């Protein structure tokens, strides 16, 4: 069953179809596992270290490459007014936001951790999805919850270290 509508973009043009399919399969599995509403949408972009570095610099004031960045559309920013979508009779699907993954950073980390690039891409995709759902790891208690759920999803899928 397809729960998520995933708009996938490979800016690198180097990602294997099998890797893209694995990441989509893991995200679909995670969506079912986490009981995400059918038809929910997200975008997933694969980019280079330089591409993610530019995004990190522009939006997070960090001038360095990172592995994954998520932009949650349901997360309130400073000075934003919350909209109660329930008062509107809309048939629009839920849009979670954007996940951006550096394939180069995924390769580097896979080598460092001694597992496959595919495993690292799957890990980063689930990590990004959890951020879109509001999970974070800035505080130790948040980290314990998020990383525990991340491991639970990956283990249930069968993608272990």
Swiss-Prot record:
Its EC number is 3.1.-.-. The keyword Zinc applies. GO terms for molecular function: metalloendopeptidase activity; RNA endonuclease activity; zinc ion binding. Gene3D superfamilies: Metalloproteases ('zincins'), catalytic domain. InterPro entries: MetalPrtase_cat_dom_sf_prd, YbeY, YbeY_CS. GO terms for cellular component: cytoplasm. Zn(2+) binds at residues 127, 131, 137. It is found in: Cytoplasm. The keyword Zinc applies. Its cofactor is Zn(2+). One of its GO terms (biological process) is rRNA processing. NCBIfam families: rRNA maturation RNase YbeY (TIGR00043). Belongs to the endoribonuclease YbeY family. PANTHER family: ENDORIBONUCLEASE YBEY, CHLOROPLASTIC. This is Endoribonuclease YbeY. It comes from Listeria monocytogenes serovar 1/2a (strain ATCC BAA-679 / EGD-e).
